[in-house]
Every structure is written in C-alpha cells, then in structure tokens.
C-alpha cells in the first residue's frame, strides 16, 4: 500500500474540489488546472514519457469531442431553437393545462416534463425550465426548486441523450446497453419513490387555520398516480435501455410516464375527490390545434424517430451505416485503447438533423437557425473546455497508473466493504462538478479497477458511480444556483441546500445498502 502515490494521485481531484468549492472558480478553469497537474505528476512521479502524456491527452480530447461535445451542443441547440420559435411555451402550456391540483402539476411539470428535458438536453435545463414553470403557476420559489431538484437526480445518468452512460462505458470499455440496464436496476427503487416524495413536498401547504396537511392528506387521491408515474417511467426506460441503449431510455420513460400521469390526472380531476386545499387558480391558455401541437413537438419527435430508426432495433439501417466509421489508436505507450468514430450513426448528427428540420417546421428561417447555433456554441464553450480537460486528465491518470494507485489504496483500506463507498464517490463527483458525465470521467476507471481487484462485476461497480450521481447532482452548488436563478431568487442557497440535503443523505444510505446486497445478482 503506497500512501505517497495515493495522496499524489488524488492531487488533481483535490485541486478540482478546492478550486470549485472554496475559491469559486468556474469549472473550466479548475478542470484545466487538474489536467495540468495530472500531466506534471505523471511525468515527475510516475515517469510517463512526454510523448505518452501528449498522446494520452490527445486520446482524451478526441473522445470528448466526438461524440460527447457533439451531443451536448446538438441537444442544447435543439432546446435553444425551440425557445426562440416559441415551441417550448406551447409545450409548457399543454402540460400545465391538464390539472389544477398542485401535487399533480408538480408530477407533470417537474417529474415527467423535467425528465424529458433531462433526457433531451440536460445541463441545467431540466431544473431551470420546470422550476420557472412551477413558480409561474404560483408555487413558492424555494419549494418549486426543491421539487425540481428531487425530480432531476435519478434521470441524470441518461441526460443529454445518454451521454453520461455512453461516455463512461467507452472510457472503461463496457457495453453501454448492459451498463445502462444495470444502472436502471439499481436506480429502480428511487424512480418509484421519487414521485411520492414530490407529491409530499408539493402538498405541504397550510389551511386557513395554519394547519399543515398531514402525510396521509397529501397522498390522498394522488398516491396511486404518483406510484404509477414512477413505475411507468422506470419500466419503459428499462425496456429501452435493454434493447436500444441509454440514449433514449429516459426520453421514452418520461414520455410514457407523462402520457399515463396525464390520463390519471384528468381522471382524478373529474372524480371530484381531490382535496380543495391543493387547488391552484390557473388561467386557461389559448386553444391549441393538433397542427400547432405537432409543430411544437416536431424537433423532439424527429429526434426520437431518427435515433430509434438507426438503432439496433432496425438492423438493416444500423448495418448499412456501420461502415461509416474510423477506428484509431492514439496512445503511443503500452496497451493503447481504440477510439471508434461513427461519422453518421451517432446521436449528435441525428439531433442536429432533427433540429434543422424541426426548426424549419416551426417557422425558423435559416438565418435564425444559424444565429441560435452560433449562440449555442458560444454558450457551451466553457462546458466544452471542461469536458476536454476532464477527459484528458482521466486518460493521463489512467495510463500513468494514478488511477491504479487510488483504487489499490481504497481496496486495501476498505476491502470487501468498498462497494458501500462506491455510490458516495460518484456523489462527490456530481456534487463538485454538477455533472454526471464529469463524475463518470473522474471516477469510472477507479470503480472499474476496484471491481477487478475485488472480483465483482465491472458493470455493477461502475453503475454504482451513476447511482451516487443521482444523489450528488441534487445538492451540487451549480445545480442549486441554476434553480434559484430560474425563479429569480438570490441568497437562498443555504436554505435550499438545507431542504434537499436530508433527501440526498437518505438516498446515499439506501444506495450503500443496495451496493452491498445486490453485488451478487446475476446481472
């Protein structure tokens, strides 16, 4: 057990934590510092030649650019374009017109629509947009953000068309379909429980005498809706993950959940059994035609059709596009990895195509589309730099042996109890960076090597990192700031953190139990 090597290997990670949390540096600056430190340490302590450091870095940069950065920019561009064309306003109006019960509205907006936004775009949109919608409907600001934080955690490993799962699978050499499936098995209890928690938070209101509704009163009339909302979400997502992959798991899951929740909500409204204290006065929006509704959803419908039509479910198309790919080895040292660049059949390409066509359907001119694309690239440049730096750092640390030093020390100290710590490690990554993708890039290799040392499934251990991300994301300072900014509130970060922290801590305890009890499952 080399304590010195362990401590030195942690320096790039500690740097990132300290710079982000203590000195409030932007993520891209802190990530560059971590990358530079990893290169210096790899050369000075692990004696990795300069050429190998350079090629390891280049491998990380290329992996970040294609497909991760491509998908990120494409997804956010699609969202930005829908905002500029007014499509997002139409979609929001459609969802909020379904019910006037605050508990059901929270499910529809934060859980179903928020899950859809996470699957399609991610990067804060799934907290900011639903939180703003809830506040606009009359929810108090901090509870509105709290509801969206609770809703946003569990779908995060499949955000931005599955990028967190796809990227960590590529990094550690695992099959993305199998990894996505194992992750969903681990996350399933939280998918089912979270809508119930959302209902409890949304229903925490007082009557005219100041008496707060009890737990039973808050659940009355909507508990079944919440339960089925969660079950339908994870059930549909699991099927998609098993047969299509992580890219559409949360997208399809959220759509199925939205359709079922909307139907059940309308039925509950008509029953007349909903408690009047949870009623909200909502102004009726303009009557929408089928044409305007389809136009508003066109970008997302096209993304769904294109990704599904080019997946393994359509072997003829999938096989025809497979040759349009390049396989290269960049690292010049021992045991280099192989990078695969799919030039056509990659989610980013299809998302861009869907956005261009959908934007035209929504009435966007080529000039407007170009303006939105340019603005999106500029908007996402800090994220691009962060991804390049984090992937470069991860590759240098991996090839130099720094990851091995960290995992060897953790195994020596924790032994067979290491799986208990695995979700907490993933949570720390998400808490610090505010990103499920970055957490996987930082700690995915550590989890994989720990699995090999313990003789347990790589898939189970790497999936535990994503499990922890679900809890860490909801307490990340970046996520809190995005949510509060969306409801135009300042100085409430501590109050919001205090409200969400017990939920995250409770989740992590349950995650550790799942980590230990489930490692023997035949997955």
Q: Which ranges hold each PLM region?
A:
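Juxtamembrane helix-boundary/capping and inter-helix hinge elements in multi-pass membrane proteins
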Residues: 25, 84-87, 100-101, 134-144, ...
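Structural signal for alpha-helical transmembrane segments and their membrane-water exit/capping regions
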Residues: 4-6, 16-52, 74-85, 261-272, ...
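Membrane-embedded alpha-helical segments and adjacent helix-loop junctions characteristic
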Residues: 54-137, 146, 363-450
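Interfacial loop-to-helix junctions that mark the boundaries of transmembrane helices
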Residues: 1-5, 24-30, 54-66, 178-185, ...
């Amino acid at each position: 057990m080399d304590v010195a090597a362990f401590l030195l290997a942690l320096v790039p990670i500690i740097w990132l934590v300290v710079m982000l949390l203590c000195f409030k540096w932007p993520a891209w600056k802190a990530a560059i510092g971590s990358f530079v430190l990893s290169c210096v340490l790899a050369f000075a302590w692990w004696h990795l030649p300069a050429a190998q450091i350079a090629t390891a870095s280049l491998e990380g940069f290329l992996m970040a650019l294609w497909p991760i950065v491509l998908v990120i920019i494409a997804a956010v561009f699609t969202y930005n374009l829908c905002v500029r064309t007014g499509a997002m306003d139409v979609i929001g109006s459609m969802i909020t017109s379904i019910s006037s019960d605050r508990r059901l509205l929270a499910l529809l907006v934060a859980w179903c629509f928020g899950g859809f936004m996470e699957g399609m775009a991610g990067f804060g949109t799934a907290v900011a947009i639903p939180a703003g919608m809830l506040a606009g409907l009359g929810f108090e600001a901090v509870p509105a953000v709290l509801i969206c934080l609770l809703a946003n955690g569990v779908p995060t490993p499949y955000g931005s068309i599955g990028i967190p799962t796809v990227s960590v699978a590529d990094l550690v050499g695992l099959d993305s379909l199998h990894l996505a499936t194992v992750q969903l098995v681990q996350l399933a209890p939280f998918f089912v429980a979270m809508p119930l928690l959302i209902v409890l938070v949304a229903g925490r209101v007082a009557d005219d005498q100041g008496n707060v509704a009890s737990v039973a009163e808050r659940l009355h009339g909507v508990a079944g809706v919440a339960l089925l909302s969660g079950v339908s979400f994870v059930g549909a997502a699991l099927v998609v993950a098993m047969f299509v992959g992580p890219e559409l798991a949360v997208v399809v899951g959220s759509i199925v959940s939205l359709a079922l929740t909307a139907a059940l909500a309308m039925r509950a409204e008509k029953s007349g059994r909903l408690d009047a204290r949870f009623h909200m006065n909502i102004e009726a929006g303009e009557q929408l035609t089928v044409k305007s509704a389809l136009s508003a959803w066109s970008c997302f419908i096209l993304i769904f059709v294109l990704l599904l039509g080019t997946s393994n479910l359509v072997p003829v198309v999938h096989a025809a596009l497979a040759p349009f790919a390049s396989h290269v080895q960049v690292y010049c040292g021992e045991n280099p990895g192989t990078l695969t660049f799919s030039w056509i059949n990659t989610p980013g390409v299809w998302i861009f195509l869907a956005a261009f066509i959908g934007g035209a359907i929504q009435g966007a001119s080529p000039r407007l589309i170009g303006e939105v694309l340019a603005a999106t690239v500029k908007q996402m440049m800090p994220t691009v730099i962060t991804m390049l730096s984090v992937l470069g750092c991860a590759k240098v640390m991996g090839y130099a042996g720094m990851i091995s030093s960290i995992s060897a020390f953790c195994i020596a100290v924790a032994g067979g109890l290491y799986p208990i710590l695995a979700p907490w490690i993933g949570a720390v990554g998400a808490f610090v960076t505010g990103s499920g993708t970055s957490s996987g890039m930082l700690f995915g290799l550590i989890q994989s090597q720990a699995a090999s040392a313990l003789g347990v499934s790589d898939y189970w251990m790497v999936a535990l990192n994503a499990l922890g991300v679900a809890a860490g994301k909801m307490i990340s300072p970046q996520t809190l700031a995005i949510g509060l900014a969306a409801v135009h509130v300042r100085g409430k970060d501590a109050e919001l953190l205090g409200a969400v922290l017990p939920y995250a801590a409770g989740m992590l305890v349950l995650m550790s139990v799942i980590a230990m009890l489930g490692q023997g499952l035949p997955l």
